[in-house]
Every structure is written in structure tokens, then in C-alpha cells.
UniProtKB/Swiss-Prot annotation:
It comes from Ipomoea nil. The keyword Disulfide bond applies. Gene3D superfamilies: Endochitinase-like. GO terms for biological process: defense response to bacterium; defense response to fungus; killing of cells of another organism. GO terms for molecular function: chitin binding. InterPro entries: Chitin-bd_1, Chitin-binding_1_CS, Endochitinase-like_sf. SMART domains: ChtBD1 (SM00270). Disulfide bonds join C3-C18, C12-C24, C17-C31, C35-C39. Keywords: Antibiotic, Antimicrobial, Chitin-binding, Disulfide bond, Fungicide, Plant defense, Pyrrolidone carboxylic acid. Signal peptide: none annotated. Its antimicrobial activity is strongly inhibited by divalent cations. This is Antimicrobial protein PN-AMP1.
Amino acid sequence: QQCGRQASGRLCGNRLCCSQWGYCGSTASYCGAGCQSQCRS
């Protein structure tokens, strides 16, 4: 895991979203339901 509660609350670089599973990305599967940080509003 790269971010979120699975990685001690770490944020993703490049303003990427953190998925519910703790990985960084910019697609809907990262930024949509369950997104932990830097999500699209």
C-alpha cells in the first residue's frame, strides 16, 4: 500500500487520489467511492 490508513495516513504525490485499498491513482476507481484522500469532490 502507498497511502491512506494502510500507510500511516500518507498522502499520494502529484495530488493523486488514494483509493480505499491504499493505492495512488487518478481514475474513478481511485477517486470515487471509498477514496481516502485528495479525492475529486
